[in-house]
Design a protein with these regions (language model features):
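Exposed, low-structure sequence patches enriched in small/polar residues
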Residues: 1-172
Length: 172
């Protein structure tokens, strides 16, 4: 498993333009164990990454404040992940014992029933008065199986008023 990232503040000499990129890769069976009591979870949640194991993920973020009261934030997350298929353990489910795998070798990241997901988000905030914000966001999520058998796309548009609260980012 690895995680690499970089952040560039005031990118290209443009004040208040911040760029961030990240890449995560976890091989099959990485956080699983021979039983669910000793795997890498806490309260049935993965400790290392919400995707568990058997995935490759790329993340890009842009945060820009063009004017003192305006903020623009964009994020794109793309990942592919191998899911278990027809009772065969391909290492994507960390709650499944690694002893149930079919072989000891030959597993690749994304192996099994491969899915590809793209999650894109655009948020715009305007500070009307001190600590009073108007927020607009548009989010698109595309989820599809690599073999083209099934897909699920969703679009979410939100608008809100925020008073004296920090903006929360939900990466899902």
């Amino acid at each position: 498993a690895y995680q690499l990232g970089a952040k560039y503040i005031d990118a290209f000499g443009i004040k208040n333009l911040d760029l961030q990129v990240e890449s995560n890769r976890v091989r099959p069976f990485t956080y699983s164990h021979n039983d669910t009591v000793t795997n890498y979870t806490h309260y049935n949640q993965p400790l290392a990454d919400p995707l568990g194991a058997n995935f490759q993920e790329y993340i890009g973020m842009v945060n820009y404040q063009p004017l003192p009261k305006w903020n623009i934030y964009a994020r794109a997350i793309y990942y592919y992940k191998g899911l278990d298929s027809a009772g065969i353990n391909f290492g994507g489910d960390i709650f499944e014992s690694y002893n149930t795998r079919s072989n000891d070798f030959g597993f690749a990241v994304g192996g099994g029933n491969k899915i590809k997901v793209l999650n894109a988000l655009l948020q715009v905030s305007y500070e009307v008065k001190q600590n009073l914000f108007l927020d607009l966001s548009l989010q698109q999520r595309n989820y599809k199986y690599a073999n083209g058998s099934e897909s699920n796309n969703s679009t979410l548009f939100t608008a809100g008023i925020r008073l004296n609260m920090a903006k929360r980012q939900y990466d899902y």
